[in-house]
């Protein structure tokens, strides 16, 4: 083994022993690297296998060519990028490098230092919004005719506080002139916390390792939600009561689907109030509007028509959707609050 590295016939016995030990260490390091690489590969395969387990319980339905054509015509398979964070709120590189903005950014930094006690006090308002506020109003101050002060001169504490108050006042006046901030649509249901329904508690007790029930969505069904040609329940992002029901692995799958025409989605189980289980798929689509803007929706598909038919759902019915976990698998529970439920249970 040692001859393959170096010809050391001229070395003494102790030198040969040292080199031999060195080669053993090198071979050991290579073996450890290969074992770590194999272990990471196994972990990655286990994560993928977790997502495939749902198809063992509920085989995926074969989609007809008619449904595929209708979905393509309706534009549901179009993809686009989205972000939960509005990057337009942050200054661009050109704005940061602009000398006219240097003093404004410096003033914002001084205000942050001056308001350090507010950060220490939990009852006070977070200052992150103040930082974003200063960045947004930095561009509007370019029109001021005042001589810019020397940026190398330290900013006095009183001046920083005064400048911040002026920025707030100008922002409030500007919002009044433009009609104020656009308010988000309010769901027709109460947003207050509700206890887990008794029937759902019983269902989770019967299922293996079921836990973490969350009320995530409430809706009055539209005609498109019960139309057999649509075969999906639309859940707009803006109407979700909470969006923390996906794991990191499931979120990565949903994010990768954004740029794919053929979306994979996340497998899940839906339980109705009759304790019947259905296999569904959760996917993310962009709904295009005539104005050119779009909105992102979650959609429950691949079995939704069967759920509508079995529960007698119709336009105008009110439903609530809960999420929970059973053996790590994503599960949904549909609570129906309408006369249709009484007819189905009879």
Curated annotation (Swiss-Prot):
* Disordered: annotated span: 168-187
Keywords from UniProt, A to Z, are:
DNA-binding, Nucleus, Transcription, Transcription regulation
One of the entry's Gene Ontology molecular-function terms is: DNA binding
Where in or outside the cell it occurs: the entry states:
Nucleus
Q: Where's DNA bound on this chain? A: 237-338
Q: Name one Pfam family in it.
A: At2g31720-like
Its cellular-component GO annotations read:
nucleus
Descriptive protein name: B3 domain-containing protein At3g25182
